[in-house]
Curated annotation (Swiss-Prot):
Family assignment from sequence similarity: Belongs to the MinC family.
Top-level taxon: Bacteria
Record carries keyword Cell cycle: yes
InterPro entries: CAP/MinC_C, MinC, MinC_C_sf, MinC_N_1, Septum_form_inhib_MinC_C
PANTHER family assigned to the protein according to its UniProt record, in alphabetical order: SEPTUM SITE-DETERMINING PROTEIN MINC (PTHR34108:SF1)
Name of the protein described by the UniProt record: Probable septum site-determining protein MinC
GO biological processes: cell morphogenesis; division septum assembly; regulation of cell septum assembly
Species whose genome carries this gene: Shouchella clausii (strain KSM-K16) (Alkalihalobacillus clausii)
Function comment: Cell division inhibitor that blocks the formation of polar Z ring septums. Rapidly oscillates between the poles of the cell to destabilize FtsZ filaments that have formed before they mature into polar Z rings. Prevents FtsZ polymerization.
Keywords: Cell cycle, Cell division, Septation
Subunit structure: Interacts with MinD and FtsZ.
Gene: minC
Length: 227
């Protein structure tokens, strides 16, 4: 008796291929059907050809690192394919805890003085100042409702879309993820309106703009990235 429903559906997109994987069958059944489908000559390619990027749509299936390695071995064997992204409706408990930490915002009411280093998981709202010689780091974004005259490091664990905002932006240095910006003349950054620092991924550097301009700037960056 033949099985009517396919466990693997392959769709072409402008960016590559999307593999829709059934989340109700066993993982072994999934691997077997994927191996059978990819054995067709249509999917074979040489290393000299441009790689085909693959998005894996897992539905409500969770894969550990060992499962992903097995899946990647099937996809890449004998063909120039690269798994670019896994899209799953479920996550592990550890991933959920990490997302919770990054999403939460901690409010601090204090001054960060010279020589002090304060580290926060997630976003942080500081009601106070960061004095010269002080350092505030966060895995998320940093919002200073006061003067930022010391240093601030947002996206401490690599979050590149983190931001640093301050009511008075006059820092000695800013860092977002692994990108840094230092100031020789801090007075030139002092203005009456709140400013925000963020990563411009087009040129890979930190930009500082008025908070009111963030939406316009984001649209400009997206337009440049597409063109």
């Amino acid at each position: 008796m033949t099985r009517g429903k396919s466990f693997v559906t392959i769709k072409g997109t402008k960016d590559g291929l999307t593999f829709l994987l059934d989340d109700r069958c066993s993982f072994d059944e999934l691997i077997k059907e994927l191996t059978d489908k990819l054995s067709a000559n249509y999917y074979k390619s040489g290393e000299e050809e441009r790689p085909v990027y693959v998005k894996m749509d897992l539905g409500n299936r969770y894969l550990n690192e060992e499962d992903k390695a097995q899946l990647e071995a099937v996809v890449t064997e004998g063909r120039n394919m690269r798994i670019e992204h896994y899209d799953s409706g479920v996550i592990s408990w550890e991933e959920a805890q990490l997302m919770k930490e990054h999403a939460q915002t901690t409010t601090l009411t204090r001054m960060i003085r010279s020589g002090q280093v304060v580290h926060v998981k997630g976003n942080v709202l500081l009601v106070g100042d960061i004095n010269p010689g002080g350092l505030l780091t966060a895995t998320g974004s940093i919002y200073v409702m006061g003067a930022l005259k010391g240093r601030a490091h947002a996206g401490f664990e690599g979050k590149r879309d983190a931001r640093i905002c301050a009511a008075m932006m006059a820092p000695a240095g800013l860092q977002i993820a692994d990108e840094s910006l230092y100031f020789v003349d801090k007075d030139e950054a002092v203005e009456d309106h709140m400013k925000a620092a963020f990563l411009d991924e087009v040129n890979g550097s930190i930009r500082i703009e008025r908070v009111q301009r963030l939406l316009d700037v984001a649209a400009e960056i997206n337009k440049e990235a597409v063109s």
